[in-house]
Amino acid sequence: MKIPLFFNNTARSARVGRFRRWLDRHRDFFDVIEPESREDMLNHLVSQANSGAPAVAVAGGDGTLGIAARALCNTETVLAPFPAGTMNVFSREIGIRPDFDHALHILNTGRSKNVDLFAFNGQVFLQMAGIGADARAVELTTWEMKKKWKALAYVIAGARVCTEKQPHLTLRSEE
């Protein structure tokens, strides 16, 4: 039985090209689904979970995996990440190296673990949500920067945030 593999065909990470070449050699394992949008991916993943799929593979970065987490939370369907993004923080944190063969090996062993998710204003988050300077640095990090500088792009954006006028808040208390 082929595993449904969701591939973010709009992702522009340098790893996406490598993943496509890797996938060409491993298509026998997967039923590849390339949704047209984030909403389309979410709907397809929910449909897979509702139909009782035991597992779905998702190739992409942290943003793509976040969409998958929203769709699959509180279901019995296992998420099998294939790290194809720039940073792949979540995959690294759960022990999946940025190596597609390693991700396939883990999928084939059936090894899984439960992870805690959190929600804010009804939005499910897989690993973190940032505010302030952290969120601004992510906002300033463009695809072009990630392509040229890879992980260093976030450091560069963070430095830019430090040069911006910072908001000021004063709290007063009776004490």
Provide a role label for each language-model segment.
Residues M1-V56, G66, R70, N74, ...:
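ATP/NTP phosphate-donor binding region
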Residues P4-F7, N74-V78, F82-E174:
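Catalytic core of DAGKc-family lipid kinases
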Residues V58-D62:
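N-terminal glycine-rich "phosphate-gripper" loop used for MgATP/nucleotide binding
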